[in-house]
Amino acid sequence: MKIEKVHIKNVKGIKDLELSFKKDDKILDVIVLAGVNGSGKTTILESIKDFFNNKNINYDEPEKSNANLDIFLEEFEKKNIEEAKKKSDYFKGKSKLSDFFNALHLYSFDKNIKNASYEIQIEKYFKIPPKIIYVPANNNFGEVETETSTLLRDYEFINTVDSELMEDIPSYIATRRNYLATIEEDLTMKEITNKVVDEINGIFNILELDVKLKGFSKDEKTMPIFENSAGEEFDINDLSSGEKQLFLRTLSIKMLEPKNSIILIDEPELSLHPKWQQRIIEVYKKIGENNQIIIATHSPHILGSVSSENIFILYREENGKIEAKTGDELYSSYGQPIDRVLKDIMGLESVRTPKIEKDLEELRKLVDEDKYDTKEFKEKYSELLEILGNTDEDLFLIDMDVKIKQKVNSNVESK
């Protein structure tokens, strides 16, 4: 299941915005929303979540809804829905997509529904039903510990990654080890542990982390134990804020086992080193199977890791209406240096501190006016040289311009 189009009307600051996630007859697997504060990034994520939560929706007249989505279903999903409808005692006529979502909701909350119900049939034909996973920006990371090694998670259609969910991470890892021990009877417990460790570390390999999962504590808590390159060991609660953010957010999504699902992540760059920001989307893509990932970000490092067709730059018109640029409306983003992304994609006028940029511009103007020998030029140049150093690219280019000007003016005077 994937979103093909989003249409939001009169939700917070968004008056009327339509975004198409279909490019060249293919639904995008990764969508990156960017823009200044107040441009509607988080509102879009929340509106998508609310749509599946039946908020602000008019199913009889979708065009009157505050949020309306065009949903793309794989052929096997369409077939499963049709078969479930045939076997249930509910439908007499044509079913709607909203009935499918309602069935997923009902199955989440009521496990005692009768066998002939549409909900049971949906569960029967969808061994792994799709999920909506929302990862908000603000999460409080408290102490976590292993509560059980037999963690059971019932299916839920709408999932929010919050501190309560994150508390289950140690229990999830311990349960994963126990589960593998029951199906891999020929392996020793040490081999089972190594298998779990490799499975989890494999998610983060692309980040080249200094810290890796090593195993479990020897006491009854069986806490996940990490080790750094210096050989120092510590449990998950002693990770740095960036490491903890990375592991808890990512493993929370993995714990939900998304397949054919939609994952909404607000500001994944929080507390992450720029090197990790450049590769974090690849980490999320390795979790689960055939998911659609929609991200809201301020990070130029994340924007530089995807193609411009995956990027939607949100901006506010003079009349207050929020619009979006994408694809051919943007410069190429993938693989570009950060300063290019900041200027060409995010619209930043300069990557320098405004005062320094202003002083450089004044130097350029003095050169253009042939005032490079004046006291004003020499004083400004000396000040900037002391601040920026003699390897600064802009000062080097100004030097080159001065030399060219001197040569041209010298030739003119000699004639």
Regions found by a protein language model. Name each.
Residues 25-27, 124-126, 131, 143, ...:
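Acidic, Mg2+-coordinating catalytic modules of nucleic-acid enzymes
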Residues 1-58, 217-355:
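Switch/communication elements of ASCE P-loop NTPase nucleotide-binding domains
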Residues 89-208, 342:
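Coupling/switch segment of ABC-type P-loop NTPase heads
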Residues 196-200, 280, 337-338, 380:
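Generic structural signal for hydrophobic residues
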Residues 46-114:
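Conserved P-loop NTP-binding catalytic core
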Residues 51, 172, 179-182, 359-369:
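Solvent-exposed, amphipathic alpha-helical segments
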Residues 211-215:
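A short acidic/basic microdomain associated with nuclease active sites
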